[in-house]
């Protein structure tokens, strides 16, 4: 299922005073993610390492705000900070795994919250694993086959995350699913 992989070095630019103020004034924690808003990865798995923080000169600095970093939303609707220990690799489930497992696995909604200070960047590495473009995005057939996003499983999606069923159908391949996903987000 995951013969296609690529890595990205992700750089999150320092927040402006305006972005910090908007993040601080957000009505809820769910609305306070200025570095990267809520989304699901549409691939199969995403491997992540602990982020590092840098100043404007590129020197490594400690995280200046313990509330800054990666957050996930679990199936019960709880927003949790994902603290990745040094030297560890963690994985997030993507929507392709959700589809190809018939909903047994569920994609992990996640976002990145910036610090409440200017002049600090965030750096991390993500390893994205995904099907080949022509891979069928069909649920398993046979006994136990079911809808990958049953009723009630969308109730805890964060604002801005389009429901899977609004972008996917059982006749698509991975490339078609990718295009529909990009169109829904952008």
What is the predicted function of each stretch?
Residues 1-186:
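C-terminal flanking tails of non-heme Fe-dependent oxygenases
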């Amino acid at each position: 299922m995951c013969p296609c992989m690529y890595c990205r070095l992700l750089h999150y630019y320092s927040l402006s005073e305006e972005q910090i103020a908007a993040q601080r004034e957000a009505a809820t924690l769910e609305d306070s993610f200025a570095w990267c808003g809520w989304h699901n990865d549409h691939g199969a798995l995403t491997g992540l390492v602990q982020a590092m923080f840098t100043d404007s000169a590129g020197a490594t600095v400690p995280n200046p705000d313990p509330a800054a970093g990666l957050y996930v939303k679990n199936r019960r609707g709880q927003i949790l900070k994902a603290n990745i220990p040094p030297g560890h690799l963690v994985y997030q489930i993507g929507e392709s795994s959700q589809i190809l497992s018939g909903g047994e696995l569920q994609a992990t909604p996640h976002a990145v919250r910036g610090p409440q200070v200017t002049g600090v960047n965030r750096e991390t590495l993500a390893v994205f694993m995904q099907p080949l473009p022509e891979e069928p995005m069909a649920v398993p057939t046979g006994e136990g086959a079911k809808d990958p996003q049953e009723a009630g499983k969308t109730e805890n999606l964060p604002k801005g995350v389009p429901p899977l069923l609004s972008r996917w159908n059982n006749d698509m391949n991975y490339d078609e699913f990718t295009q529909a996903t990009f169109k829904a987000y952008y």
